[in-house]
């Protein structure tokens, strides 16, 4: 698996009246210098009194924040996999998923807070709907507002042009212009969708046994859309289930890299997804226009990031 060190642990045991049976759930978290956020995430899981037991696996990307010692001391039930370098998100998440023993596998970001009952609600909903292969909760921002990216359609040309030009915000009730983030749909409605956010996503084990794990061509973005797409192609359904809720603080996760690489990988992931799943649906001129759009947006994003750094340049933290 490419891991350097592992802590052998037992499962987390907590009693509850209507909990999840033992060995049914594995939660996999990738972290990179995010120990403060991870502690909050783990505490929110531990405080979720509707769980009887679960397996928690933390995969570290070469952090320098003492995370291994912290977990060994304060969270001895957590299984730890340590990498020497920052491998992004997809590869280390696969390390965790391939180690996991649970019937259900959950991808979870370290900068999240599980709200009461969320995990149990997701599992009960999937238990009652065996056709669902992947399910995700309602994701909230730190201020309690809805995080629109938690449920999405595929990044098709018109949807993405509308998204990039912010037409979806101007015409949120339009299925044509508001399609990528499904802005015309009720945020409190259970909904079959094309894709969910990897910040919190519950996957049935049979899905990865059938279609494989995350595609490691994706460094850190659109890997969630890709696995959802492959699941749908295999006949599984993907559902957004807002009865379960989490908070995602954002930007403090496990794959943080230099800003320019992050920008490049973000745009590359859209190009890769389009080439892999959508290009055959369109005439080649449409495809080249889409690729050109991505290049133009990439150049603009790099320039904007450079100008922001110049504008806000100041003393660095020592």
Q: What feature does the model see in each segment?
A:
Residues 229-310:
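Active-site-adjacent helix/loop segment of glycosyltransferases
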Residues 44, 60-68, 85:
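A conserved acidic beta->alpha catalytic loop
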Residues 115-149:
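Conserved donor NDP-sugar-binding/catalytic core segment of glycosyltransferases
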Residues 43-53:
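Short, acidic, metal-binding catalytic loop of nucleotide-sugar glycosyltransferases
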Residues 154-193:
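Short, flexible, basic/aromatic active-site loop/helix in glycosyltransferases
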Residues 83-100, 121:
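Glycine-rich, basic loop-to-helix element that forms the pyrophosphate-binding segment
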Residues 186-245:
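A short, conserved alpha-helix in the catalytic core of glycosyltransferases
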Residues 105:
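Short aromatic/hydrophobic "clamp" motif used to bind/position activated sugar donors
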């Amino acid at each position: 698996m490419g891991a350097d060190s592992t802590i052998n642990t037992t499962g987390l045991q907590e009693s509850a009246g209507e909990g999840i049976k033992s060995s049914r759930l594995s939660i996999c978290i990738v972290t990179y210098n995010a120990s403060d956020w991870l502690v909050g995430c783990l505490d929110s899981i531990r405080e979720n009194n509707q769980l009887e037991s679960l397996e928690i696996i933390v995969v570290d990307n070469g952090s320098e924040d003492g995370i291994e010692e912290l977990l060994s001391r304060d969270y001895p039930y957590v299984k730890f996999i340590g990498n020497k370098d920052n491998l992004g998100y997809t590869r280390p998440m696969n390390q965790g998923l391939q180690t996991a023993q649970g019937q259900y596998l959950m991808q979870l970001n370290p900068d999240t807070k599980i709200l009461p009952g969320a995990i149990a609600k997701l599992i009960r909903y999937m238990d009652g709907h065996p056709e669902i292969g992947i399910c995700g909760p309602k994701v909230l921002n730190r201020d309690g507002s809805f995080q629109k990216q938690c449920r999405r359609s595929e990044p098709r040309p018109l949807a993405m042009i509308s998204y990039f030009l912010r037409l979806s915000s101007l015409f949120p009730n339009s299925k044509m212009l508001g399609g990528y983030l499904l802005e015309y749909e009720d945020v409190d409605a259970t909904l079959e969708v094309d894709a969910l956010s990897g910040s919190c996503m519950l996957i049935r084990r049979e899905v990865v046994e059938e279609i494989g794990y995350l595609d490691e061509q994706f460094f850190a973005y659109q890997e969630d859309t890709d696995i959802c797409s492959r699941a749908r192609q295999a006949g599984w359904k993907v559902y957004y289930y807002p009865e379960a809720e989490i908070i995602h603080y954002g930007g403090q996760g496990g794959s943080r890299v230099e800003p320019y690489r992050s920008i490049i990988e973000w745009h590359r992931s859209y190009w890769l997804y389009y080439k892999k799943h959508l290009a055959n649906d369109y005439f080649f001129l449409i495809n080249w226009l889409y690729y050109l759009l991505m290049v133009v947006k990439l150049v603009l994003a790099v320039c904007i990031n450079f100008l922001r750094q110049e504008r806000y340049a100041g003393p660095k933290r020592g």
